[in-house]
């Protein structure tokens, strides 16, 4: 009887271990916005935590956000010199989601080192490829900075736009997936109470954006919210209709 019990336990463990090992590892790399600064409870409200809930048990999502981190290696707090970066490399994620650039709008950084941004970003991605050659990298257009920010008109607004363009350039050069954290948050400045850090609701929007990018699930075929009941459309004129659909869905 004891031998049968031991054999049963061994079989269960041997069956369970491969299931655990098959979990897809997702590394969320970023700054204080990824970390969850400003949230009442970052342990339950940060976007990586909410992403874990959306993706479910077949994924393992880890938060490697570092408050104040810059993408620029010559910035005032380079991400590549932080402990979170070393932990992210050790994690060797199957998927790496990068949201950096907000802190590079600092007047100490972008005006002086902007020419290094694209190269530094490409090099950062290469370090993740070295620890996992099969890694899937997703990079994000930055979340908005509201006009309440104390440096908004003295450079931050323009530099933020320039960095967005640089991030798009990085995506083209590297051939990686580009997602947009800016557009879904921009219409709702109330979700950025300190002008920079999203609320729990804002973090949920970020999590949903990443979830859709990873899984291809965009909620099925649907029109843009711009199109509402009883809206007036011009007749006898070709119209460009916007909307979303799941990846691979026939429209």
Located regions from the model:
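Bacterial Sec-dependent N-terminal signal peptides
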Residues: 1-21
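Helix C-cap/helix->beta junction micro-motif
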Residues: 55, 131-133, 173-174
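Conserved SGNH/GDSL esterase-like catalytic core that processes O-acyl groups on lipids
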Residues: 22-28, 33-122, 158
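Non-catalytic, glycine-rich low-complexity segments
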Residues: 219-247
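Alpha-helical scaffolding segments of alpha/beta enzyme cores, especially the outer helices
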Residues: 116-119, 123-130, 162-169
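Active-site segments of SGNH/GDSL-like serine hydrolases
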Residues: 99-105, 126-161
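Catalytic His-Asp segment of secreted/periplasmic serine-dependent ester chemistry enzymes
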Residues: 39, 142-220
């Amino acid at each position: 009887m004891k031998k049968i019990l031991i054999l049963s336990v061994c079989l269960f463990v041997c069956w369970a271990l491969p299931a655990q090992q098959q979990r897809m590892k997702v590394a969320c790399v970023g700054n204080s916005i990824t970390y969850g600064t400003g949230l009442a409870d970052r342990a339950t409200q940060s976007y990586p935590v909410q992403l874990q809930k959306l993706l479910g048990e077949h994924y393992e999502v880890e938060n490697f956000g570092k408050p104040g981190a810059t993408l620029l290696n010559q910035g005032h707090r380079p991400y590549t010199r932080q402990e979170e970066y070393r932990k992210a490399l050790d994690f060797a994620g199957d998927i790496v989601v990068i949201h950096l650039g907000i802190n590079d709008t600092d007047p100490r950084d972008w005006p002086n080192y902007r020419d290094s941004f694209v190269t530094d970003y490409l090099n950062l991605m290469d370090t993740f490829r070295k620890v996992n050659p099969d890694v899937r990298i997703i990079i994000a257009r930055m979340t908005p900075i509201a006009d309440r920010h104390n440096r908004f008109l003295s450079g931050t607004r323009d530099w933020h736009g320039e960095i967005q363009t640089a991030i798009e350039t990085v995506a083209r050069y590297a051939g990686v997936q580009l997602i947009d954290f800016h557009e879904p948050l921009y219409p709702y400045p109330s979700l950025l109470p300190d002008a920079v850090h999203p609320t729990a609701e804002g973090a949920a929007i970020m999590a949903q954006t990443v979830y859709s990018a990873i899984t291809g699930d965009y909620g099925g075929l649907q029109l843009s919210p711009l199109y509402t009941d009883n809206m007036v459309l011009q007749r006898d004129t070709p119209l460009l209709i916007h909307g979303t659909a799941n990846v691979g869905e026939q429209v």
